[in-house]
């Protein structure tokens, strides 16, 4: 974000007040980004009425973007935020470090997530495997925070977790190397809304599983999956929202209409409340409709896998389905973003602005929990390495808990 020299700021403030002349255009170079933020907030911000008056913010328009935003947003607002517009290159890999020797400074990284189209995905790295070495060098306390920070290509030594327990009950843990993975350099890649899905059999139940990281009204994978699940006789669905952070309200409507009981179709899913300026261009409510080209699965219950990363519209989906069907949460507490947001991009300033614009309530007028939803069945995602398995594996920690719950 920008920095403004102190002396220059003093000169500008003096000139702004000189001769009663409007000199704002002359200083747009220094204030334009914050004026853009201000203009959006005064039109769309949920708490627009509580914003300081324009004349009270004269000095603040010359501040950094973050400083300006903290000055004008409502104190209860923990969601409105700024980010760089540029997509950042990535390996598409998440991991959790663990010390694997009590006597030596040896660590390994347990892979917890892999994006399919990423360098990690292309290298064939799977969730639940372990990174033991990078280019032949071990992971230690000294390099544990930097061993994959340079963004370059590397040759990873991959391992598998193994436990042995002797007759006296003493457990020994091994990470056994089994393959090399050529990890390409960080890059910008296309993310997939629904990266993993499958159909499982659990007792007399046909279970449809889908890892849904984002849903929009244009998420075609949801439509095709609904038809696949219907054709294969799926009568239970496990919806994995552990990594769902950036969905849309029309996507919520589509997914809810696929999952809900047929008796709920035509009923209100969600109601919106905007600021006092009202916005006729935005919908005031969303209705459960028979999805165009998709199948309604007519489910009485949906099992939702959650984590601390589950946020925003994903939480509204949980909340707005509850009046219509049984929603069983398994995993961890969700983040707790109880408002709807809009994202605005500005290429001139290289900024992406995520702005709270509405209160969302379910059909009974109930808002999502500001502190997040606590799970009905609390399960740690990674505490048992033997259950950190590829998504959709029946032995994976959260999915196995969901199957146990639906068959008990």
Predicted regions and their residues:
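C-terminal "post-core" interaction segments
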Residues: 210, 217, 222-224, 229, ...
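Bacterial Sec-dependent N-terminal signal peptides
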Residues: 1-36, 44, 52
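Extended, small/polar residue-biased N-terminal targeting/export presequences
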Residues: 27-109, 153, 160-194
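C-terminal, low-ordered peptide segments at domain boundaries
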Residues: 135-234
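Short, solvent-exposed loop/turn and secondary-structure capping segments
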Residues: 105-106, 123-125, 142-145, 249-253, ...
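PDZ/PDZ-like domain segments forming the peptide/carboxylate-binding groove
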Residues: 87-133, 137-140, 216-220
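Extracytoplasmic
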Residues: 88-92, 106-108, 126, 151-153, ...
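Terminal peptide-recognition signature
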Residues: 37, 93, 120, 128-131, ...
């Amino acid at each position: 974000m920008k920095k403004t020299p102190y002396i220059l700021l003093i000169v500008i403030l003096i000139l702004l007040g000189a001769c009663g002349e409007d000199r704002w255009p002359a200083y747009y170079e220094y204030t334009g980004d914050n004026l853009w933020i201000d203009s959006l907030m005064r039109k769309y911000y949920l708490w627009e009425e509580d914003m300081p008056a324009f004349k009270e913010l004269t000095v603040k328009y010359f501040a950094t973007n973050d400083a300006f935003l903290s000055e004008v947003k409502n104190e209860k607002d923990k969601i409105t935020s700024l980010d760089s517009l540029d997509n950042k290159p990535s390996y598409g890999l998440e991991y959790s470090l663990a010390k694997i020797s009590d006597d030596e400074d040896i660590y390994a990284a347990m892979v917890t997530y892999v994006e399919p189209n990423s360098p990690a995905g292309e290298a064939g790295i799977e969730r639940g495997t372990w990174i033991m070495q990078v280019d032949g060098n071990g992971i230690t306390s000294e390099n544990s925070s930097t061993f994959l920070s340079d963004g370059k290509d590397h040759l990873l030594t991959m391992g598998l977790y193994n436990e042995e327990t002797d007759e006296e009950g003493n457990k020994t843990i091994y990470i056994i190397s089994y393959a090399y993975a050529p990890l390409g350099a960080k890059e910008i890649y296309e993310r997939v809304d629904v990266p993993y899905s499958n159909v499982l059999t659990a007792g007399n139940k046909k279970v449809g599983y889908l890892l849904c990281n984002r849903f929009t009204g244009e998420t075609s994978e949801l439509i095709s999956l609904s038809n696949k699940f219907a054709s294969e006789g799926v009568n239970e669905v496990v919806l994995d929202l552990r990594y769902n952070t950036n969905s849309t309200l029309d996507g919520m409507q589509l997914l809810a209409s696929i999952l809900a009981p047929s008796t709920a179709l035509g009923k209100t899913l969600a109601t919106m409340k905007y600021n006092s300026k009202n916005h006729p261009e935005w919908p005031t409510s969303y209705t459960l409709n028979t999805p165009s080209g998709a199948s309604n699965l007519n489910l009485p219950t949906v099992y939702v896998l959650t984590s601390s990363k589950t946020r925003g519209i994903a939480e509204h989906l949980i909340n707005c389905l509850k009046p219509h069907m049984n929603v069983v949460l398994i995993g961890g507490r969700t983040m707790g973003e109880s408002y709807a947001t809009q994202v605005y991009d500005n290429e001139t300033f290289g900024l992406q602005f995520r702005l709270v614009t509405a209160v969302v309530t379910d059909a009974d007028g109930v808002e999502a929990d500001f502190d997040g939803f606590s799970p009905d069945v609390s399960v740690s995602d990674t505490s048992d390495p033997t259950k950190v398995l590829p998504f959709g594996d029946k032995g994976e920690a959260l999915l196995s808990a969901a199957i146990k719950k639906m068959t008990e």
